[in-house]
């Protein structure tokens, strides 16, 4: 079997448009929605930024100091209720984990509510997603959310008494 030549690969790579990427996003969402026999009452989605190491000199792979490598940093959204893949957004390697995630959430909720107007939605993510744009979109679309918080002196000071109460209540 012959492999594609470099010019063929270049033409293929450059033929991909924003429109085709959006159509691909819709294929995954359409399949997810169609996988349900009845409208779900509640769905929980996990947000994850995944470090994808580069092997060579691909476009938009950049150095990411946290991961100590050249990479892409795609956002992956999966459904915690059935382990299905729901959405993927390819982002450049030096992106912040939450880059444009608010737009992805808004689009996802809009599509879900079009299919199931009464579905309750819950998003979960680590502390990288605990940024103002994410809180804003979750509040605007009236969805539940659980985002981690990075430990800081202020957070520890403000939660110290609550932690002590919880320890006493559990008899630890």
Ranges and model annotations:
Residues 90-172:
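An internal, acidic/charged active-site-proximal segment
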């Amino acid at each position: 079997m012959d492999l594609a030549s470099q010019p063929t690969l270049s033409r293929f790579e450059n033929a991909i448009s924003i429109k085709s990427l959006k159509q691909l996003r819709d294929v995954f969402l359409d399949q997810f929605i169609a996988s349900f026999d009845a409208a779900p009452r509640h769905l929980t989605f996990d947000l994850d930024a995944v470090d994808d190491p580069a092997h060579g000199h691909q476009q938009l792979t950049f150095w990411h100091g946290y991961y100590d490598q050249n990479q892409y940093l795609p956002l992956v959204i999966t459904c915690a209720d059935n382990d299905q893949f729901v959405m993927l957004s390819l982002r450049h390697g030096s992106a912040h984990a939450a880059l444009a995630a608010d737009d992805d959430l808004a689009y996802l909720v809009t599509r879900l509510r079009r299919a199931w107007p009464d579905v309750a939605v819950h998003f979960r993510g680590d502390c990288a997603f605990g940024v103002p744009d994410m809180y804003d979109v979750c509040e605007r679309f009236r969805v539940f959310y659980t985002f981690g918080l990075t430990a800081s002196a202020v957070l520890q000071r403000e939660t110290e008494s609550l932690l002590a109460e919880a320890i006493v209540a559990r008899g630890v």
